[in-house]
A protein has these predicted regions:
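Sec/Tat signal peptide C-region and signal peptidase I cleavage site
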Residues: 14-20
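Sec-dependent N-terminal signal peptides
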Residues: 5-14
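C-terminal tail/sorting-segment detector
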Residues: 3, 360-370
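Structural signature of tandem-repeat unit edges
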Residues: 20-26, 43-51, 63-86, 97-110, ...
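Terminal processing/anchoring signals of secreted or surface-associated proteins
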Residues: 45, 308, 331-332, 350, ...
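Residue-level detector of functionally pivotal "anchor" positions at catalytic/ligand-binding pockets or at interdomain
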Residues: 326-349
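A recurrent domain-boundary module in secreted/ectodomain proteins
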Residues: 307-331
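Consensus positions within tandem repeat domains that build extended binding/scaffold surfaces
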Residues: 90-92, 112-115, 138-141, 162-165, ...
Length: 370
């Protein structure tokens, strides 16, 4: 009995090992002659050499784990459609229900439209780490897939993430750290990613625009997508509804900011906003709901509380959560008129001043702007 069990375990082990295959493709277009996918799913396949769109499409729904790191993608024309070299072809794995892991080719410069759209392999993961020449991720490249994470760290050649590129996936973490050439996040690029818990934009120094609804509904299921820190970016404009209904705790805006468009933060759950430019941006209609604006904690540059209060249209008690980097506020103390006149105030030199003094004063141990 023990011998039978040992033989069975050995057979199972050998069967598992047999499923890991490495194939070198000398001539692009010849994969069919090297790998038989008839009525089978390959657990683990590594390709090397040269392949084209037909080779890759041939593997659709037939491979669980695919390593293309050392593959070169060759140009191919199918009908009247040209599939360029060094580009992950449009729609090549669209609707794949088996693929759960892929290591992308190191030489690609672009991921085509819908390349991995609706890939539903269990816990789908993509390794971008070797893609040092990647410049563009096209429309819907990974949309509506089971993708678990977007880790584009260190991809210094990446310039554009197009519309709907990562729309409605299962991603929990977005990291663009070190994407120093990234210029644009397209319309709905990360929209409806309900499970996100963190977003890393550190080092995205060239980022200029965040598209319409780019982060709409982010973190809706996780209830906390953390902090959206745009401070190192060069963003001048947040498009309409770009952060609408997002479940982020804190948003830090860059010093380059000029415009926050209509409904950019409408229905957002943000509890903290921080602005870095001395000049308030232009705010579009309902950029944030009136009630939320009165309750969110807002930090602005030193000495700029009044300018921002005017830009927000806040005054009196409605501005109680607005303060500058030094803690100075508009002086909303919620005290009676009778006691207000007797309130002791001191300037920054420690000298007592009267009610007519204008500038930063100390009241009740707090800095306020008069």
């Amino acid at each position: 009995m023990k011998l039978k069990s040992l033989l069975l375990c050995t057979f199972i082990g050998l069967s598992s090992l047999a499923q890991a295959e490495t194939v070198h493709v000398t001539t692009a277009g010849s994969l069919k002659t090297l790998v038989d996918t008839t009525a089978r799913v390959i657990d683990d396949l590594t390709l090397t050499g040269s392949v084209n769109r037909s080779d890759l499409h041939y593997l659709r729904n037939h491979v669980k784990k695919l390593n293309l790191k050392d593959v070169t993608i060759a140009e191919e024309t199918v009908g009247k459609v040209l599939y360029p070299d060094n580009v992950m072809p449009d729609s090549v794995f669209i609707g794949d229900k088996v693929l759960s892991s892929i290591v992308l080719p190191s030489g690609i410069v672009e991921i085509g439209k819908c390349a991995f759209n609706e890939v539903r392999g269990a816990a789908f993961t993509v390794d971008f780490s070797n893609c040092k020449h990647l410049q563009t991720i096209r429309n819907n490249a990974f949309s509506e897939s089971n993708l678990q994470e977007v880790n584009l760290d260190g991809l210094t050649a990446l310039q554009t993430i197009d519309a709907y590129a990562f729309y409605w996936t299962d991603i929990k973490r977005i990291s663009l750290e070190g994407c120093s050439s990234l210029i644009m996040l397209g319309e709905r690029a990360f929209c409806n990613n309900y499970f996100v818990t963190s977003v890393n934009l550190k080092g995205c120094t060239s980022l200029q625009s965040v598209g319409n609804r780019a982060f709409l509904n982010i973190g809706k299921q996780s209830k906390d997508a953390g902090t959206l820190d745009f401070s190192e970016t060069a963003i001048e404009s947040f498009d309409e509804s770009s952060l609408q209904s997002s479940w982020v705790k804190t948003v830090i805006f860059p010093a380059t900011l000029k415009t926050i468009s209509a409904k950019a933060l409408y229905l957002s759950k943000a509890a903290n906003l921080k602005f870095l430019d001395d000049v308030p941006p232009t705010f579009g209609t309902q950029w944030m709901s009136d009630s939320a604006l009165k309750h969110v904690n807002i930090t602005v540059p030193a000495g700029k509380v009044k300018a921002y209060a005017d830009a927000f249209g806040l005054s009196g008690a409605d501005a109680k959560n607005l303060a500058d980097a030094n803690g100075a506020t508009l002086g909303i103390n919620r005290i009676s008129a009778a006691t207000a006149s007797a309130q002791k105030r001191y300037n920054m030199a420690g000298q007592r001043v009267g009610n007519g003094y204008r500038g930063i004063v100390i009241e009740n141990g707090k800095k306020v702007v008069r």
